[in-house]
Amino acid sequence: MANLKDIRDRIVSVKNTRKITEAMRLVAAAKVRRAQEQVLRSRPFADRLARVLENIQSRMSFEMADAPLLKTSDLKTITLLAVTGDRGLCGGYNSNIIKRTEQRYAELNGQGYKVDLVLIGRKAITYFSNRSSQYTIRATFTGLEQVPTSDDAESITTEVLAEFLSQSTDRIEVIYTKFINLVSCNPVVQTLLPLDPQGIAEADDEIFRLTTKDSRLTVEKGVGPANEQPPLPSDIIFEQSPEQLLNALLPLYLQNQMLRALQESAASELASRMTAMNNASDNAKALAKTLTLDYNKARQAAITQEILEVVGGSCT
């Protein structure tokens, strides 16, 4: 009977666990839709802002070096900005970013560059802090909103801008999880600063589409929203000089790109958590069914044994 009790206790435990995972799945499913809509809503603004910047730069006669955020220099120090979550129970979401960061770190070290880390999310901070002898951590950020806000993006952008403008780093790359759909999210590496990618840039740069070509700002054609924005009028009149506008709008553009990376990461985390909890619920259901069968078999065997003992006793 002790065996029956153990099986019965396991069945109760598994069913209670399934209730928890099912509740977490429903919560993640409700949030991921909002996060997905937020990602899609933010894309037209960034696309239009990129085109405005291109229009402004087309009227400029000064060299790129006059815009600090467009300056390129000899690469010596590169900062990797890794975006993870504060919580677990989301499948391989956090571990995939950590693995990609380690891989990129090794690639750049192998090319002779000094590499620093800026970490977003408790999971990345915990992992790399435990290996502080191997990695140089410049800054950390935790406690961001589940639905990222412009304030979150501003605090991070302010930090990395200060590093770049003070020439503490020559290049900043962000490693985050690109949201594709509810079942597909990929960790990607994207160049954040400067806006002129060079040889070691990754090839899958799809979100940060503002770049430079022949010393002029251009907009790369890549994967974007389904609805294309209409072209800008060619006769726009700006009150300020192009130089003033460019230097004022570039930080806004970078902040917007940081916000979009955070938004895509948040949507990917929620989608991964929803998938993980759905799988956990299915596994709990299957396990409960198996345990119930085992319980019934054990109970039937116990009853049969008791009957045999009674029959055997009566015969003697």
Swiss-Prot record:
It comes from the Bacteria. GO terms for molecular function: ATP binding; proton-transporting ATP synthase activity, rotational mechanism. Its main location: membrane. It is found in: Cellular thylakoid membrane. Signal peptide: none annotated. Keywords: ATP synthesis, CF(1), Hydrogen ion transport, Ion transport, Membrane, Thylakoid, Transport. InterPro entries: ATP_synth_F1_ATPase_gsu, ATP_synth_F1_gsu. GO terms for cellular component: plasma membrane-derived thylakoid membrane; proton-transporting ATP synthase complex. It is a peripheral membrane protein. It holds the Pfam family ATP-synt. Belongs to the ATPase gamma chain family. HAMAP family: ATP_synth_gamma_bact. F-type ATPases have 2 components, CF(1) - the catalytic core - and CF(0) - the membrane proton channel. CF(1) has five subunits: alpha(3), beta(3), gamma(1), delta(1), epsilon(1). CF(0) has three main subunits: a, b and c. Produces ATP from ADP in the presence of a proton gradient across the membrane. The gamma chain is believed to be important in regulating ATPase activity and the flow of protons through the CF(0) complex. This is ATP synthase gamma chain.
